[in-house]
A protein has these predicted regions:
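Aromatic-residue-lined binding/catalytic grooves and analogous aromatic/hydrophobic interfacial grooves
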Residues: 34-512, 530-532, 542, 550-553, ...
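Short loop-to-helix capping motifs
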Residues: 537-538
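Extended, hydrophobic alpha-helical segments in both membrane/secreted and soluble proteins
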Residues: 520-531, 544-557, 702, 719, ...
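C-terminal capping/lid segments that line or modulate ligand- or cofactor-binding pockets
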Residues: 57-81, 86, 91-104, 109-110, ...
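Generic recognition of well-ordered alpha-helical segments
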Residues: 311, 358, 469, 527, ...
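Short, surface-exposed polybasic-and-hydrophobic patches located at secondary-structure transitions
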Residues: 813-823
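N-terminal export signals
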Residues: 2-3, 7-29
């Protein structure tokens, strides 16, 4: 992994005339930003700081779904050796110069490797043996050993493009420094002053123009002097094209060993053979107004300009998950040049306008205020974000939580768009060649959590990459089912890469609790059906969702076996990443019929049965699913009063495990609810309390899950307590979620997304078919307003509350029909109207039913 190199400024001259200042255009962009702020009254939508980022994890992210960049707002003050570890510089901290700029770049298809069959072809011969070890011999340790023999190859790793640097030189000292990320315009801006000249840098990632844009301006003519250069650990060459273009080319590794995984593999394997690792190209065009621009020794040199605009595009040799990435370097570079040519035809003001308009059509759908609007200089929003975070424990800051909520939506918009790859463990942002957990799609909760907020937070289009991903996975998963287990349908495990690896990974040394867990297919299929529930898109259900769900159900139906007690069970079965204490008092991993397996299969079968009925198909198959569903091991309450994690009431070897897989039917599932299954809800609460009492939820994503659990249990104050813990202990200064890893913390984006979804759950729930309003409102949020949340049934919901009580709600369905609403605890729905009162009837569960007309907005009042 290479550090980011920089060389000294080399004087050169090549005159390029420039006559027009861009202050007018800059003003147009600012006007767009101001109009955006006006559309979010009472909202605080900026992360801002008074010093540059001194390490990668403190930089500010921009992205268009495909391209991503971390914007430092500064650059290293001294040269760094490109051959040394990138982590030493990028993970820092290192001294930074605010007059410089650093963008660490990513493109969502740059991965190591190529399509391979990672299945262990000897695996299926061990399936009977592992089942006998568990069910007949009760030898769980032997079962663990056999599971190792069923493991295949590790997945590949997400790779960094490199870094782009702009080193400005000034004769005086920098004062008045500020860098910010404005969620209203998806733009990172850095401002400072040198003597009487004000400097500004603005960066954004445009989806419509498929480019990253960096604009640098001075308030007085001729005051910009800069060197533009690029570097990276995988970079093969950096060269200039003409006097104003910089071309960076490189090649991803043939193979990357999983960071932190056991084994003796060479960590990084490079190859010069075409198709063994993909080529990539990043090309930057520089336009100046005023001054001179010259190319010299792989750098671009700017002298005496007033503005400087950089356009950057990136392409890779990726073709498809099932095709070798054998595109030549020349072809990849030409594709990048064509993309840049298209973007370069637009003026800067057009680039800004198109970017902001595109972004706002997603972001503007939801607004959230968790307190009265305050505009005086003493409000928390007037403090830098790192200070607000530091002060959170002593001075709880509801507006910071509203900002955090919107930041999660921003990150999803920036990392997942139709046509892109899904958001991975770090979204689309990564600086390491060998990143933690390969920066892949870990599917025993992480990729699923990434998409928890997509539907409820009104970003349904952002789920499209996940839906397409599942379709791809069904192909490799069918091969995994056949070659690993000798079974029909499709299966996937916990570790998936660009090539859609579906096999159990580990190469014989992986822990069975993650390597041999085989239930990610049913979990991912839950997202297919949830997308249908939120959108009511019947054509999607018929042509895309149901066929994939059916394939997963076919595997599960064949995977189930008799347990000897009249039930159907799964074996081998793992409760994700948690061991249990075997009868001999030693930890073991592999058993039969873990609670999560039963929950996922029961949910999948139910969704398939409902879909088949809705579509009028597969009556016989649905009947088979129904018969099998009735024989699944039921949920059980253990000796501590807890929801059992395993079919046998084992004790956990790690009572504070961050994974809480047996709680799936509470959230994100919907089988356990306080009203519908009160005894099981009580047991789930005991399980949650035991986990937290033993130090559980120590990672950001696990804490986010706890917030969602408390929300589903209707305990707003406990949800707030966990949310507060997340802000204090699992949130970085740039509001990235963190995962503790020894002496340092690792960025993992799932906690951001999980917490955003959990906040939405505190304000509105719809998983039972009833739209529950303010189901888990904490005392800490006595007043507030939310607009634009989405409920299942394709209903948009807004709410306003004061003194802890709902004042009004706005309901807008996409379809005509009957809907059920429930008032907050202690209140009742007084009226529902759309110009005239809508008849309503109270049901036995306390909710009210009413018929609503599509595309009309209804006002709900409360008593």
């Amino acid at each position: 992994m290479g550090r980011f190199t920089r060389r000294g400024f080399v004087a050169a001259a090549s005159t390029v005339a420039g006559n027009l200042l861009l202050s007018k255009r800059s003003g147009q962009a600012q006007a767009l930003s101001n109009s955006k702020k006006a559309s979010h009254p009472g909202s605080d939508l900026k992360l801002w700081y008074t010093s540059p980022a001194s390490q990668w994890v403190d930089a500010l992210p921009i992205g268009n779904g495909r391209l991503g960049a971390m914007v430092f707002g500064g650059g290293a003050t001294k040269p760094v050796d490109a051959k040394d570890s990138a982590a030493d510089h990028a993970a820092g901290p290192v001294p930074t110069d605010p007059a410089k700029e650093t963008l660490v770049l990513n493109e969502d298809t740059l991965w190591s490797g190529l399509p391979v069959d990672g299945n262990n072809l000897d695996a299926k011969q061990y399936l009977t043996a592992v089942r006998q070890a568990v069910l007949d011999q009760k030898d769980y340790h032997l079962a663990d050993q056999i599971c190792h023999k069923m493991q295949g190859l590790f997945a590949e790793a997400y790779q960094p493009i490199g870094s782009l640097h702009v080193d400005c030189t000034h004769s005086g000292a920098v004062t008045g420094y500020r860098r910010e990320l404005d969620l209203a315009s998806a733009t990172v801006t850095t401002r400072y002053k040198v003597d009487d000249v004000e400097y500004e840098r603005s960066a954004f990632a445009s989806a419509p123009d498929r480019a990253i844009v960096l604009r640098i301006s001075a308030s007085k003519p001729g005051q910009l002097h800069a060197t533009i250069w690029a570097a990276g650990a995988l970079v093969k060459s950096v060269q200039t094209i003409g006097s104003n273009r910089l071309l960076l080319t490189g090649k991803a590794a043939k193979h990357i060993a999983g960071a932190g995984h056991p084994g003796s593999e060479i960590p990084v394997v490079h190859s010069d053979v075409p198709g063994e690792g993909m080529y990539y190209a990043a090309i930057t065009e520089v336009k100046t107004e005023g001054g001179q621009i010259a190319a010299h020794e792989g750098k671009l040199l700017i002298q005496g300009a007033t503005t400087c605009t950089l356009l950057l595009t990136v392409t890779t040799g990726y073709r498809s998950f099932d095709q070798k990435p054998d595109m030549s370097q020349d072809e990849v570079s030409q594709r990048a040049s064509r993309q840049l040519d298209a973007a370069a035809t637009r003026t800067y003001s057009d680039l800004v306008r198109r970017h902001v308009e595109d972004y706002r059509r997603f972001f503007d759908r939801v607004t959230l205020s968790l307190g009265p609007d305050k505009t005086d200089s003493n409000t928390a929003a007037s403090q830098p974000t790192d200070e607000r975070l530091k002060n959170f424990a002593a001075a709880p800051d509801p507006s910071l939580l509203a900002l955090y909520f919107q930041y999660g939506r921003y990150l999803l918009i920036s990392s997942s768009r139709p046509g892109t790859q899904p958001a991975n463990l770090q979204g689309i942002w990564n600086y390491q060649v060998q990143p933690p957990w390969s920066c892949n799609w870990t599917s025993n909760i992480n990729i699923q959590m990434n998409y928890w907020p997509a539907e409820s937070c009104n970003l349904t289009e952002c789920t499209e990459p996940l839906l397409a991903f599942i379709a791809d996975l069904s192909h490799t998963g069918a091969r995994a089912a056949r070659e690993t287990y000798g079974l029909p349908g499709w299966v996937s495990h916990h570790n998936i890469d660009l090539w859609r690896a579906a096999n159990p990974v580990g190469t014989g040394v992986g822990s069975p609790t993650w390597a041999n867990w085989s239930m990610s297919g049913p979990w991912l299929c839950g997202h297919l059906y949830e997308h249908y529930r939120f959108t009511r898109d019947r054509e999607f259900l018929r042509t895309r969702a149901y066929p994939l769900m059916k394939g997963s159900a076919e595997f599960c139906l064949a995977w189930l076996i008799e347990d000897g007690n009249g039930h159907l069970t799964t074996c081998p079965s793992e409760s994700t990443e948690n061991d249990f204490m075997a009868p001999d008092g030693k930890p073991a991993m592999t058993s039969a019929g873990c609670t999560m397996d039963m929950a996922l299969i029961r949910e999948l079968f139910t969704n398939c049965i409902l879909s088949a009925k809705e579509l009028g198909v597969d009556e016989v198959f649905a009947a088979k699913l129904d018969a099998a569903r009735s024989r699944l091991i039921p949920y059980q309450v253990g000796k501590f009063g807890q929801l059992q994690e395993w079919a046998i009431d084992f004790e956990e070897s790690t009572p504070g495990q961050r994974h809480m897989s047996h709680m799936y039917p509470l959230y994100p599932g919907s089988e356990i609810t306080p009203r519908g299954t009160p005894q099981l809800a009580k047991a789930a609460r005991v399980s949650l309390e035991r986990r937290l009492a033993n130090g559980g939820a120590y990672t950001g994503w696990s804490r986010a899950w706890a917030i969602a659990f408390w929300s589903r249990l209707g305990d707003g104050d406990k949800a707030w307590e966990s949310l507060s813990m997340l802000m204090q202990h699992s949130t970085n200064v740039n509001l990235f979620d963190t995962h503790p890893a020894g002496k340092t913390s690792i960025f993992q984006i799932d906690g951001n997304f999980g917490a955003t979804a959990a906040i939405a759950e505190m304000l509105m729930q719809s998983h039972t078919g009833v739209i529950d309003l303010l189901p888990a409102l904490p005392v800490a949020w006595p007043a507030g307003e939310v607009k634009g949340l989405k409920a299942r049934g394709a209903v948009e919901v807004g709410l306003r509350w004061e003194q802890g009580k709902a004042v009004s709600a706005m309901i807008r369905p996409d379809f005509s029909g009957e809907y059920q609403l429930r008032a907050p605890e202690g209140q009742k729905i007084e009226s529902i109207s759309n110009g005239s009162s809508v008849p309503q009837r109270t049901l036995s569960d306390g909710s009210v039913a009413c018929r609503l007309t599509a595309k009309r907005t209804y006002r709900v009042s409360f008593a």
